[in-house]
């Protein structure tokens, strides 16, 4: 949406060159704030699957963005977990990465998971995580795929997906940083996607922080 502003007179002591430089600086400040990479919102409204339907058929791609302004517009209008009802998920992943175990970026990875029993807590943790991701606040940002907010009847979950599950040192560093980001004091557990695929999850998770 274009903005219309009244033109301000240039001070008599300013040369046209100085005034032009000032105008250019102001225009740059008002322009969109670009992110280091593109990100994509996804959503998954889960209903009773049809017989023979493949997993992930309800997963839909939402919007891809690359500016701070676009993120806030999408978050405020649509992608807030408390707006979800029933069994549904919101995902924020790097553009080009699908929130599926089968995606090459996720295939050998895993996830840190936290539980939330209150929608307000989930909203806050989701927002803080999204801002940390798009703001590249993690030292191991190349290892992160994205985050998933899962709303369920009994309790909600937030999961941070990463690429290389076998690299314990990196995953532990990411887990510790994430706890700081969302101000989480309870134990956090990391599980391998391979364990979930085999339906034999490691008891208590592979790593904890």
From Swiss-Prot:
Q: Which keywords does UniProt give here?
A: Cytoplasm, Disulfide bond, Initiation factor, Nucleus, Protein biosynthesis, RNA-binding, Translation regulation
Q: Which PROSITE patterns match?
A: IF4E (PS00813)
Q: List the disulfide bonds.
A: 106-145
Q: Biological process GO annotation list?
A: regulation of translation; translational initiation
Q: InterPro entries from the xrefs?
A: TIF_eIF4e-like (IPR023398), TIF_eIF_4E (IPR001040), TIF_eIF_4E_CS (IPR019770)
For this record, the Gene Ontology CC terms, alphabetical, are: eukaryotic translation initiation factor 4F complex; nucleus
Under the subunit heading, UniProt states: EIF4F is a multi-subunit complex, the composition of which varies with external and internal environmental conditions. It is composed of at least EIF4A, EIF4E and EIF4G. EIF4E is also known to interact with other partners. In higher plants two isoforms of EIF4F have been identified, named isoform EIF4F and isoform EIF(iso)4F. Isoform EIF4F has subunits p220 and p26, whereas isoform EIF(iso)4F has subunits p82 and p28.
Task performed by this protein: Component of the protein complex eIF4F, which is involved in the recognition of the mRNA cap, ATP-dependent unwinding of 5'-terminal secondary structure and recruitment of mRNA to the ribosome. Recognizes and binds the 7-methylguanosine-containing mRNA cap during an early step in the initiation of protein synthesis and facilitates ribosome binding by inducing the unwinding of the mRNAs secondary structures.
Please report which protein family the annotation says this sequence is part of: Belongs to the eukaryotic initiation factor 4E family.
The name under which this protein is listed is Eukaryotic translation initiation factor isoform 4E-2
Give the source species: Triticum aestivum (Wheat)
């Amino acid at each position: 949406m274009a903005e219309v502003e009244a033109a301000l007179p240039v001070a008599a002591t300013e040369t046209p060159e100085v005034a032009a430089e000032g105008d250019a600086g102001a225009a740059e400040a008002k322009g969109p704030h670009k992110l280091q990479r593109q990100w994509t919102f996804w959503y998954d409204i889960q209903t009773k699957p049809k017989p023979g339907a493949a997993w992930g058929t309800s997963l839909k791609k939402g919007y891809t963005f690359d500016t701070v302004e676009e993120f806030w517009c999408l978050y405020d209008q649509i992608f807030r977990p408390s707006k979800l009802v029933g069994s549904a998920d919101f995902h924020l992943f790097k553009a080009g990465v699908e929130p599926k175990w089968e995606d090459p970026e996720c295939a050998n990875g895993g996830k840190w998971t936290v539980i939330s029993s209150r929608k307000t807590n989930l909203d806050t943790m989701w927002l803080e995580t999204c801002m940390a991701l798009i703001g590249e606040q993690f030292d191991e940002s190349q290892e992160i795929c994205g985050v998933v907010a899962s709303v369920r009847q009994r309790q909600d979950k937030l999961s941070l997906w990463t690429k290389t599950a076998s690299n314990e040192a990196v995953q532990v560093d990411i887990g510790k940083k994430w706890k700081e980001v969302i101000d989480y004091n309870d134990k956090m557990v990391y599980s391998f996607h391979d364990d979930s695929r085999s339906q034999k999850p490691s008891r208590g998770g592979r790593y904890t922080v």
